């Protein structure tokens, strides 16, 4: 049975900026003329092994046009790959700051900031570090990381040293259809037309016939030698002054990543330190909820971003 191809309702413009010595790729929907003080640019941050184009379905589902910018993180999509063989989390926060400088200047007005998964983690840290630069904050399943014990540090460092001896690799796919098949196998809730469209955004030709490779640096798979500093993250969460919208899928399962080391309940306790947080569950949806339920996400976003709330004073 044939499936009609997905056709974006709102076309994205592709462009690049140079920040921190790297050529960083962005997508833009709408026009800056659509912004106002109470309707600033919405900046979207994708997750690990994802790309900026992943937000296309949510942008298409908006009832009204708005100015949206999405960033390909370093080593993903069309952004440049750094020379280093290991990725450290603060690098993403630094990239966001300097990319925003390039887009809006250092004296910029507050933006609306959304992140999914890893991008949600970055968004939370950034909003706690630069609370005066974020008007509204949206986190789509950026659960953070499990607590690590200091006793884990020696073994973690040793495993990282061992990993450095072997180049990381991402397997190629015979064609773009195989990429789409992998997407639907990983996420059975993903519609076939969306999977086919995403496959063309997530992968690129290798030069070997129809073969495709994911647009991601394989070094993203290498572990960090450092324990997660959960208490540091929580201090930043406490400094978030923007209203926060948290959205999760009803079928997402954090045990897939961390077993019994970290639960949704523990993360929800962490959210309690954020002064102004709304929480929503959408479904049926898994971790890729922006693919599964883009219409629900768009509706929640538009309602949340249009709310009128007085700003909270930054804690001293």
Q: What is the role of each PLM region?
A:
Residues 1-42, 63-66, 104-107, 161-162, ...:
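Alpha/beta-hydrolase fold catalytic core
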Residues 25-81:
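Conserved HGGG/HGGXW glycine-rich cap/lid loop of the alpha/beta-hydrolase fold
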Residues 93-109:
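Conserved acidic catalytic loop of the alpha/beta-hydrolase fold
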Residues 109-152:
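Conserved hydrolase catalytic core segment
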Residues 140-173:
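A catalytic-pocket lid/entrance helix-loop region that shapes and gates access to the active site
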Residues 169-227:
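Conserved alpha/beta-hydrolase catalytic His-Asp/Glu region
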Residues 241-285:
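Conserved loop-alpha-helix segment in the C-terminal half of the alpha/beta-hydrolase fold
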Residues 282-294:
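Catalytic histidine-centered segment of alpha/beta-hydrolase-like enzymes
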């Amino acid at each position: 049975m044939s499936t009609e191809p997905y056709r974006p309702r709102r076309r994205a413009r592709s462009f690049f900026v140079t920040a921190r010595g790297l050529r960083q790729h962005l997508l833009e929907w709408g026009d800056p003329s659509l912004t106002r003080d109470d309707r600033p640019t919405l900046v979207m941050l994708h997750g690990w092994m994802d790309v900026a184009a992943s937000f296309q379905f949510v942008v298409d589902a908006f009832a009204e046009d708005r100015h949206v910018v999405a960033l390909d993180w370093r080593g993903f999509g069309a952004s440049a790959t750094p020379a280093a063989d290991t990725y450290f989390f603060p690098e993403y926060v630094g990239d966001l700051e300097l990319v925003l400088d390039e887009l809006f200047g250092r004296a910029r007005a507050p933006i609306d900031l959304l992140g999914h998964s890893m991008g949600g983690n970055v968004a939370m840290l950034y909003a706690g570090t630069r609370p005066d630069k974020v008007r509204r904050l949206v986190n789509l399943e950026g659960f953070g990381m499990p607590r690590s014990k200091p006793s884990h540090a020696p073994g973690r460092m040793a495993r990282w040293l061992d990993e450095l001896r072997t180049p990381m690799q991402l397997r190629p796919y015979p064609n773009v259809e195989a990429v789409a098949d992998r997407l639907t196998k990983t996420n059975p809730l993903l519609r076939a037309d969306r999977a086919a469209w995403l496959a063309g955004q997530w992968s690129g030709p290798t030069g070997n016939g129809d073969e495709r490779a994911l647009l991601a640096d394989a070094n993203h798979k290498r572990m960090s030698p450092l324990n997660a500093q959960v208490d540091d993250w929580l201090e930043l969460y406490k400094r978030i002054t923007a209203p926060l919208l948290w959205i999760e899928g009803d079928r997402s399962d954090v045990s897939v990543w961390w077993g019994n080391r970290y639960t949704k309940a523990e993360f929800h306790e962490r959210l309690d330190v954020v002064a102004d947080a709304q929480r929503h569950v959408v479904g049926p949806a898994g971790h890729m909820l922006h693919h599964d339920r883009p219409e629900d996400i768009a509706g929640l976003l538009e309602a949340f971003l249009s709310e009128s709330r007085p700003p909270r004073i930054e804690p001293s």
